[in-house]
Amino acid sequence: MDIYEYVSNIISDVRINGIDALKRYSEAFDNYSGGFTVTDDEIEDADKSIKPGEKDAIKNIYERIYEYHKNQFEGQKINIKNGSIYGIIYRPIDRIGLYVPGKRALPSTLMMLGIPARIAGVKSIVLCTAPENGNVNKYTLYIARLLGIREIYKIGGVQAIAAMAYGISMKPVDKIFGPGNKYVNEAKRQVFGITGIDGLYGPSEICLIADDSANINYIKNDLLSQLEHGEASSAYLITNSLRIYNEVKLENVKKYYKETVEESIELANEIAPEHLELLVNDPLKYLNIIRNAGAVYMGEYGPVPAGDYFLGVNHVLPTGSSARFSSVLTVYDFMKRISVAMPSKYDFLSAVDSGLKLASIENMKMHYKSMEARI
């Protein structure tokens, strides 16, 4: 059975059999047979079990992420000309679902998803995450409390995506956000259209460009940091320094030698990596020739792991070369754009003849009559 059929069967089972199917999959995959809803007591217990220093670190990072994202939204775009009003208005999505992997808990991802959602004005947020030994990760619950998320379910995997999309054990959501394994990705792909999705996120990637000025230890550590995410992760080193090319000997790192930094960046544009890191002299002068990357980190104090945690930039990024057409997660992903038009009589009459001609070309008779009646 291929992955499409495997995932499709689970989604269909959950859609048709509801909570009974969720219980079966929770027992089979998570060894869990309890209730799905996380209680206030569980959230309180998680809060009490976290050390003050850990809370301070989480709050500091929370504030940095909030500060970075709060100015992304530039407001409504309304233009008034000749008595006409045209523009774009923005509205938050009514209800979203956040998926946070539970088996290898990454609570930082919840901040990267939840903070821009709150800034966007999303009122209703549901969180699904798989339990480990019957419990949700305590840091995930603490961050959910900071975000004001009270609707939390102990549901993971494909069944969580199906539950959020079809409203099993909860109200259905309008859009699902969050990374997962290949099965979760396939589930998101299959429910798209029933609900929205943020994207399809694969294994982590880093492409590091270094010139002869780069610190060898920084290069090695930064490349290995992304391989730490799992065996399917990718790491590329592109350098115009033969010394660095020869000294960096790491398993599972693909190395390329190019004559110049510009040529190195051109190769990186072809790779279109999730993370592009520049350890070169004067990196800013190369920024304008970078076309394809989920995120760019520059300078000796800008390693990718710092971006993963505390720089404030979002770490939910396009993978698998999808940076050719996709972007980093922002506040706008949690909003809808709605076009607005209120033409004046003068504006309408000055252009309606063109509209009538186009309606005739397309043989749209009622379109023609609708406009003609106003002349």
Swiss-Prot record:
Domain of life the protein comes from: Archaea
UniProt keyword terms in alphabetical order: Amino-acid biosynthesis, Histidine biosynthesis, Metal-binding, NAD, Oxidoreductase, Zinc
Full protein name: Histidinol dehydrogenase
Chemical reaction(s) catalysed: L-histidinol + 2 NAD(+) + H2O = L-histidine + 2 NADH + 3 H(+)
GO biological process annotation, one example: L-histidine biosynthetic process
Top enzyme class: oxidoreductase
Binding residues for Zn(2+): Q226, H229, D308, H367
Taxonomic lineage of the native organism: Archaea, Methanobacteriati, Thermoplasmatota, Thermoplasmata, Thermoplasmatales
Family recorded in the similarity comment: Belongs to the histidinol dehydrogenase family.
Active site: E274 (proton acceptor), H275 (proton acceptor)
Residues the entry annotates as binding substrate: S204, Q226, H229, H275, D308, E362, H367
Pfam families per the UniProt record, alphabetical: Histidinol_dh (PF00815)
Keyword Protein biosynthesis on entry: no
Gene: hisD
Known role: Catalyzes the sequential NAD-dependent oxidations of L-histidinol to L-histidinaldehyde and then to L-histidine.
PROSITE patterns given in the database record: HISOL_DEHYDROGENASE (PS00611)
Cofactor(s) annotated in UniProt: Zn(2+)
GO MF term list: histidinol dehydrogenase activity; NAD binding; zinc ion binding
Biological or metabolic pathway of the protein: Amino-acid biosynthesis; L-histidine biosynthesis; L-histidine from 5-phospho-alpha-D-ribose 1-diphosphate: step 9/9
Annotated binding of NAD(+), by residue: Y99, Q159, N181
